Amino acid sequence: IQLTIDRIKDKYTNKISSEDQANFKENLKIINNQIKQIENLVNEFSDFARMPKPLLKKNNLNKVINENINLINKIDSNIKIKLINHLSKDVNINFDLEQFNRLFFNLIKNSLESIQEKAEKDSKIHKNIDIEIRQRRDYIIVNVIDSGIGFKNKKTKELIKPYFTTKEKGTGLGLSIVDKIISDHNGSIQFLNHKNGAKVQIILPNK
């Protein structure tokens, strides 16, 4: 499809009157954006359907979170993201490294986009994402807290349903993938409205 669009652009751009050039280019831009959305949907669906069982190894949870914070900071450095470890040392537990990288990238990026959406209506809002690590008995708790738009009173089951999305350009698979990763690691996840934003709470076995 993309190749066909490029050919149409090359063939007809110089044959269209100057009055119609703007509309022609704008329509091609819209089609290109729709192609990209379809491509993203296909890729995410493929990843979701083919996600393998986790390869469990001892990994440093703090390191994974910090690496993904650094990645998200490159998208929007105006949003302050920090890791708050309430334990005396780094957390080393069994998890699939590749899947957890995807998990935290998706969650932090989701928070970032929520804040960006809120900032479009109010540029004076606090732009913060706090990621807390706590321990409760035999479990590790990770809270991702942001100052975004919240979950608009949606229930967890609705949020993790494939293809459900509140975003104009969302595929509706991001949180479904997150939920599957957590479930495959024998953990649980909750999506909560929190003060002036949202809170995602992950509970994982401490082993």
What residue spans do the PLM features occupy?
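Histidine phosphotransfer helical core of two-component systems
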Residues: 1-36, 56
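Conserved glycine-rich
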Residues: 187-188
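Detector for a conserved hydrophobic position within an alpha-helical segment of the HATPase_c
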Residues: 182-183
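Short alpha-helical Gxxx[C/S/T] motif in the catalytic ATP-binding
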Residues: 174, 178
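A conserved beta-strand-to-alpha-helix junction within the catalytic ATP-binding
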Residues: 25, 55-69, 130-133
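ATP-lid-like helix-loop hinge signature
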Residues: 112-137
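Short conserved segment of the HATPase_c
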Residues: 151-162
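Conserved catalytic submotifs in the C-terminal HATPase_c
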Residues: 80-92
